[in-house]
Amino acid sequence: MVKKVLVINGMERTLVLEGTETLAEVLRDRLLLTGCKIGCGQGHCGACNVIMDGKVTRSCITRISKVRDYARIETIEGIGTLENLHPLQAAWVAHGCAQCGFCSPGFIMSAKVLLENNPSPTREEVRDWFNKNRNLCRCTGYKPLIDAVMDAAKVLRGEMSKEDLMFKPTDNKILGTTYARPSGIAKVTGSWDFGADEIKKMPEDTLQIALVQAEVSHALIKGIDTSEAENMPGVYKVITYKDVPGKNRITGLITFPTNKGDGWDRPILCDEKVFQYGDAIA
């Protein structure tokens, strides 16, 4: 065990921790600062980026034993609020950068360090900075992220206000406009919880689901024997296709015009056939 005194979002915290814990685990598990996300867990995606002593830090690979006492750590929860967004958070919302929103906190923390050290970056410098700090996004194509940083820089330089960033409908119509995504503010402030975040905040006796997925790309199912699993300690129930009420089918997965089925071809839980690697079985 190690004793650490850390200054997290301006507040001094004294913690007794396992030396093998990562900074991300301390933030998420001990302090419930779940705005810090864990994506790859190997320091390659930037979702876990926080600021430590003024530098972008990949918290998922930073052992707490290597963090100095009184290190100053900033997370997404510490740079703005739902009512008073940081200019980067406001720009993220305005440009639609927070789509799924999982990568947004890591990007914003990286961008904050960039603008603190370079108030007038070029677009190329923004791209290079995100590459350097391993920030990855699967939703946006990156252009809106760079646009957001450039506009946030203007706000910080006093060339425009946060209010100037936001779309304002003039005819009460928002369809086809840049009207802000309703979930955007929650996602850029770290208050939008994903499944891995929700579980940190649930009662200790909350049941958890472990998904059994197909490990082959195609197969015919002759039977599913759940007896051994049901007898394992801690198992409350094993759910298979037999437990699905009504029609064990999901639509919307196959929507190509060439599809010959009725749109209800895929099971919720596999019953007769495995269609692809990773299909849910139980």
Residue ranges, per PLM feature:
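Signature of N-terminal electron-transfer/Fe-S-associated modules in redox systems
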Residues: 1-169, 173-174, 189
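Flexible, low-hydrophobicity surface segments
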Residues: 154-282
